[in-house]
Amino acid sequence: MPFTLGQRWISDTESELGLGTVVAMDARTVTLLFPSTGENRLYARSDSPVTRVMFNPGDTITSHEGWQLHIDEVKEENGLLVYVGTRLDTEETNVTLREVLLDSKLVFSKPQDRLFAGQIDRMDRFALRYRARKFQSEQYRMPYSGLRGQRTNLIPHQLNIAHDVGRRHAPRVLLADEVGLGKTIEAGMILHQQLLSGAAERVLIIVPETLQHQWLVEMLRRFNLRFALFDDERYTEAQHDAYNPFETEQLVICSLDFARRNKQRLEHLCDAEWDLLVVDEAHHLVWSTDAPSREYMAIEQLAERVPGVLLLTATPEQLGMESHFARLRLLDPNRFHDFEQFVEEQKNYRPVADAVAMLLAGNKLSNDELNRLGDLIGEQDIEPLLQAANSDRDDAQAARDELVSMLMDRHGTSRVLFRNTRNGVKGFPKRELHTVKLPLPTQYQTAIKVSGIMGARKSAEDRARDMLYPEQIYQEFEGDTGTWWNFDPRVEWLMGYLTSHRSQKVLVICTKATTALQLEQVLREREGIRAAVFHEGMSIIERDRAAAWFAEEDTGAQVLLCSEIGSEGRNFQFASNLVMFDLPFNPDLLEQRIGRLDRIGQAHDIQIHVPYLEKTAQSVLVRWYHEGLDAFEHTCPTGRAIYDSAYASLINYLAAPEETDGFDDLIKSCREQHEALKAQLEQGRDRLLEIHSNGGEKAQQLAQSIEEQDDDTNLIAFAMNLFDIVGINQDDRGDNLIVLTPSDHMLVPDFPGLPEDGCTITFERDVALSREDAQFITWEHPLIRNGLDLILSGDTGSSTISLLKNKALPVGTLLVELVYVVEAQAPKQLQLNRFLPPTPVRMLLDKNGNNLAAQVEFETFNRQLSAVNRHTGSKLVNAVQQDVHAILQLGETQIEKSARALIDNARREADEKLSGELSRLEALRAVNPNIRDDELAAIDSNRQQVLESLNQAGWRLDALRLIVVTHQ
């Protein structure tokens, strides 16, 4: 190579050194100084891995003093280059800049600059970059983006709610599905969509203290969302890092008690500028017009400051009208400000629900019914649709569906309230009750008699509570020496049941923590049964460990012994056997116990075992629950109301279980009440709301579409290609499981999302659901998203050279493959990627500017090419540099038309979609006051900003490949 002192060269292998200067040479070696790092390198003159840096007219260069020069002419004097042009800061012309005075920190970012500077990538990296661009663009355009990446079953009603709410601006909704239908998963799906799209960045989740860790684990395991758990200790710690500790994290979980206990803490929470607030178990927030609770007021303060609010709560029927109104008031205090007015409005929705019932029944409608429908909808041109719906034509069903949809839009709370019921959702198991009547031991009989004498002055309620738990009465008299478990027949029955069902998981629930602990000891010592314990005396982490041990298939605990707290919020639907060692005092707690297993996703019928002692309060209560309420084998929404009305009578029978006169009449009366109330609830069911929440056929299609996406083979091929090139080791373990571990030669020292000790992954949803240790890889998983960012945010694969062996073309024929990206810059919350994600436009040009890309598909062409080493590649580039410049000029003239077409289409789509949504909501505002003014204003503002950003859209060259034809 012809070297001269003062020339500027760049290292092919260490481009991070910047521009080097030739400072010494002899017959065999040359020394380069790299001023930006102060390092020297000694190279062999004959075969050094360096490339001469030469700029061309039209380029802009920077001097070591920082000013820039636009090159008009390049001269050579004694082997050194002199650049002549216009200085940009002073606009002075004919300014000269010798190459020795160039800025040494020069970084080549444009693909063509990298190519001409000898920074040539491996061919497979170019292919990976193009695929990454292509797939990323396609994924952004998917209509259900944000719904595919979660580790959950594809359950239509959950997907429907998440799809509807997740796309809204700052959604404020009440999720009030019946127990077991997956409100937590719905909330997680909504969060996932909002965070992925950029609609939200900061999220606060407030839950009961006992559920904090469950939410933390669910958000991470199911949605790959890493929340920070704030308690007193974490809050104090974070005060050292920021004035407002909550600003140290983007995603935060804390307990309701933690939030309301300290005034300054609540102020910090309110000031932390959250985008979304999620409140679980919101029915525990006590409110009345005159005296709202401190908890309610704390959430009210937050809800006033946070744009998006999701409240997870019990069903409106369970809450009662006033409590239901209190939740809606948190979402929109302007709309829900008068309880009496709200009650009146709810009555007025009855005709709407009746109209929907008529349409769904499929019967012909009378003229009166048609007129009523027309009045309810209030559209001028509704007549043809009504006629079609009432005809025998092929489009009759479509017309009925359209009318139902129009009625839904006008329904009072359908935009803010979602409520699915078990009646409207398929997939629930049966519940089978097995009662086991056992004799009352003499030890208990004696203890009960003595207790009756000593506690004669106790209230009936206290005596009733005592009688439900005879082991507690016995233990009180005997003290520490009492060993009730040695003679209680329920213990013998339980051990027999567990030993005869060794392969089955069994959940045992009892009221007291002491009972659970004593049972664990007996089972372990007598029969060697592996039993985990779960009670309120354990820390949250200890409870999580117990639940995880129970969940392990092979080496886990056979039985989980829970105190009553175990029936609040924890789900164990992988088990189907429930033993109630005793009975809870009210039907709500009974339903909570059964609800731990009776959830959507439960694969087996639930076997409910109730061993009870005869002649005790247990024998009274088991009959009342089963015969009076049918509460064991079916959910019982009437339970609380009947319990309240029958309370006094029931308490007396529980306090004196041997006196059964009239008890059969009480059971009969309660059963009649139950049937009547149930019929009343059924009649009052808001079917319109259920249809809206359930999603019907639309939700089924959504689930099916996502299921089809699960089979995307492009993802597997791309992921393996990505892991190979990044340098991540892959070990196929069979059963659709792959173990990924970092290697010593990765593109980056720490690949974001990959733990130091590696992780197990699967591309199969079913495997991910059955193996909690395996991560479910989709296009939305952080490993893939981080991999895409790693490749596309840098210059990996942006310039390369390949050889094409093709005897049909003359040797030395040049082709240049150009990948342009059409894109618009905008804040993430505008979600511009819905309309114009960074979109690759591929061109394959010959020296005459003919674009062969349409005839030559990328993957087919890529397989015909072979790689060139960097040294040979640099020589080739130098030889054909002028020709490549000319082809690049031709590419620049051709890209404009394609890019403009993409931008115009994106503008048209954005305008149609956002204007259409705005017009629809503005029209509905007249008939449905639940459409918020701020939501309309946000859509209008969003539309204007989106269109303005698309007006500013442009394009740039992202990658290029030089192809030279050879016959060898």
Curated annotation (Swiss-Prot):
It comes from Salmonella paratyphi C (strain RKS4594). The lineage of its organism: Bacteria, Pseudomonadati, Pseudomonadota, Gammaproteobacteria, Enterobacterales. Transcription regulator that activates transcription by stimulating RNA polymerase (RNAP) recycling in case of stress conditions such as supercoiled DNA or high salt concentrations. Probably acts by releasing the RNAP, when it is trapped or immobilized on tightly supercoiled DNA. Does not activate transcription on linear DNA. Probably not involved in DNA repair. Its EC number is 3.6.4.-. SMART domains: DEXDc, HELICc. Pfam families: Helicase_C, RapA_C, SNF2-rel_dom, Tudor_1_RapA, Tudor_RapA. It is an enzyme of class 3 (hydrolase). It comes from the Bacteria. Belongs to the SNF2/RAD54 helicase family. RapA subfamily. The gene is rapA. ATP binds at residues 177-184. This is RNA polymerase-associated protein RapA. HAMAP family: Helicase_RapA (MF_01821). A motif (DEAH box) lies at residues 280-283. Keywords: Activator, ATP-binding, DNA-binding, Helicase, Hydrolase, Nucleotide-binding, Transcription, Transcription regulation. Residues 490-685 form the Helicase C-terminal domain. GO terms for biological process: regulation of DNA-templated transcription. Residues 164-334 form the Helicase ATP-binding domain. GO terms for molecular function: ATP binding; DNA binding; helicase activity; hydrolase activity, acting on acid anhydrides. InterPro entries: Helicase_ATP-bd, Helicase_C-like, Helicase_RapA, P-loop_NTPase, RapA_C, SNF2-like_sf, SNF2/RAD54-like_C, SNF2_N. Interacts with the RNAP. Has a higher affinity for the core RNAP than for the holoenzyme. Its ATPase activity is stimulated by binding to RNAP.
